[in-house]
Amino acid sequence: MDKEIKGRLPPFTEALINHTKEKQFPFDTPGHHGGDFYNLTEEGKAFTRFYGNAMFAADMSDSGNDPGNPSSHEGAAGAAEKLAADTFGADRAWFVLHGTSVSNRICCQALLSENDLVLLDRNSHKSVYQGALLQCSAIPVCLDSLRLKNGIIAGIDKRSLNEKHLRKEAARLVPESKNRKRPYRLAVVQLATYDGFMADAKYILMKLRNLCDYILFDAAWAGYEQFLSLTESLSPLTLVLTDKDPGLLVTQSVHKQLAGFSQTSQILKKDSHLRGKKRYLPDDVLDNAFLMNISTSPYFPFFSALEMNAFLHRKYGHTLWQDAARFAVELRKKILTSCRSIAPLLPRIIDGRPWETYSTEEILSAPRFWQYGEKRNEKEHFSHTRIDPCKILLTTNRKGRPYPAMLLSLYLQERNITPEKCGLHTLLFLIQPGDQLSLIHISEPTRLA
């Protein structure tokens, strides 16, 4: 390891790097043995040259003592997960190497049994439906989605969060639940939608606190909210909880907008306020569900990437995400002032002035710049959800002249600019630290739109 970085990396990553620097004589898995199998042939050598020796050297069995078993929660692996829990404000963290689909199923399996009532955000990911309904045979009550006229999903419709109605639905489906203080074992809420809206976790907690034992916030499309002053208050992990509140589980797709390899995910558990109560989910129960769903042959670099994500966010998170949000605002302004046919989804007029005429710092300091709706009744309808500053949803029907978003998507991709997704008249761009250099490359193509 380079002298200037030695001792500055988190424990699991440093141990892994040190291990790969030593000559190994493995008689265990994986069979490529640090790439040696591939290097027996010219074609294999081309393969290892492309990826680099470190990728193969770091792919090792968990049979050895160093750097330890990533699934054990002990030693350097345990220290890595503790770092993530501390960084994100949780009591415990589990690193999951097979995506948030698996993380969601783990949480459902840990909490739900046959005929338990589960309150489901209708916009839940399929993994939630699989875990809660197919695997656990729980009974669902769905919360309707709030949709814009062009089909964009903006979160849960607050009218479906009526406690009296939800208790009535629970009693209709499971009559004996009428006598329970909290009829629902679990509620599942999408913290951030794929269309670029973020829920106010404090509002959700206030509406559901008397109804359920636990809330699972599926934050697959979030995770950075607590590192931005604008969105910090929206995070479930910044909430101060009492024994009157549900326990919280948060799943995050670290690979989506955070710093992780594809498939890396984490489960964050915040429920120490329930310890000793009957509704408390013991760590070992969640761990058993975790062990049921993971591979016994983990890819160590994936685990290391999750540790590095926590390490970087703990040390630099606020600065990096503030810079990313600043870039996202500047890009929105550039599109609004340069483009004729496309526009980012935003409240266009704020206190009588166009959105883009305000300073970037002011836009990033006040929620009103991110509250969807122009009229008072419209704003009230969306008051519990906010436009995500780090997701730019472009609409291709500016000034009432719609054209297929796919045309713009293909045009941009020909110029090596790749949107996250494309709808009929919308394009989604994800913004994260490191994107600032893209501004100069995207300016000219978008100017023509």
Predicted features and spans:
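N-terminal glycine-rich, Lys/His-bearing helix-loop that initiates the first secondary-structure elements
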Residues: M1-A54
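Short amphipathic alpha-helix segments
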Residues: P402-L412
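Conserved PLP cofactor-binding pocket of PLP-dependent enzymes
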Residues: Q413-L428
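Single conserved hydrophobic/aromatic residue that forms the stacking wall/gate
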Residues: I440-A449
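Short, surface-exposed ligand-recognition loops at beta-strand->loop->(often short) alpha-helix junctions
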Residues: T395-P402
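Structural motif of enzymes handling amino- and sulfur-group chemistry
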Residues: V285-L393, H425-T426
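Conserved N-terminal alpha-helix of the aminotransferase class I/II PLP-enzyme fold
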Residues: N53-V102
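Conserved PLP-enzyme active-site core in the AAT-like
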Residues: F12, S72, T100-S113, L117-L336
